[in-house]
């Protein structure tokens, strides 16, 4: 299980990304639209002044239950260990053991 501080840090980043998403997208669009170099530089400075953690690139997928960062399945939001256990217990609808 991941440290609680790491899980909370990721949640904080997710909140920041959602909070600044529209502002960040608007600035990026303005940068794309403008042709003047000085205006582009000033817009880049505004973009850089936003909090670092408000960028979606800094998010890392983590298991919802354990907080494990590796072996993450996007479809379920779980790590491979938890996914396997929940599938064996029948807690995931539509998931069954494969046999061929």
Swiss-Prot record:
Gene Ontology, cellular component aspect = chloroplast; small ribosomal subunit
Concerning its family, UniProt says: Belongs to the universal ribosomal protein uS14 family.
What HAMAP family has UniProt attached to this entry? Answer: Ribosomal_uS14_1
Q: Which organism is it from?
A: Chlamydomonas reinhardtii
Q: Which gene encodes it?
A: rps14
Instruction: Provide any one GO MF term from the record.
Output: rRNA binding
Q: How does the annotation summarize its subunit structure?
A: Part of the 30S ribosomal subunit.
- Purpose: Binds 16S rRNA, required for the assembly of 30S particles.
Q: Where in the cell is it found?
A: Plastid, Chloroplast
The organism's superkingdom is given as Eukaryota
Q: Which UniProt keywords apply?
A: Chloroplast, Plastid, Ribonucleoprotein, Ribosomal protein, RNA-binding, rRNA-binding
Q: Which GO terms describe its biological process?
A: translation
Is rRNA-binding among this UniProt entry's keywords? Answer: yes
Q: What is this protein called?
A: Small ribosomal subunit protein uS14c
Keyword Ribonucleoprotein listed? The answer is yes
């Amino acid at each position: 299980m991941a440290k609680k501080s790491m899980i909370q840090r990721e949640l904080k980043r997710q909140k920041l990304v959602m909070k600044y998403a529209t502002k960040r997208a608007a600035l990026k669009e303005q940068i794309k639209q403008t042709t003047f170099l000085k205006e582009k530089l000033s817009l880049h400075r505004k973009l850089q002044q936003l909090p670092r953690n408000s960028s979606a690139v800094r998010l890392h997928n983590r298991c919802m239950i354990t907080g494990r960062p590796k072996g993450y399945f996007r479809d379920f939001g779980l790590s491979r260990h938890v996914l396997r256990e929940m599938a064996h217990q029948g807690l995931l609808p539509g998931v069954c053991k494969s046999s061929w």
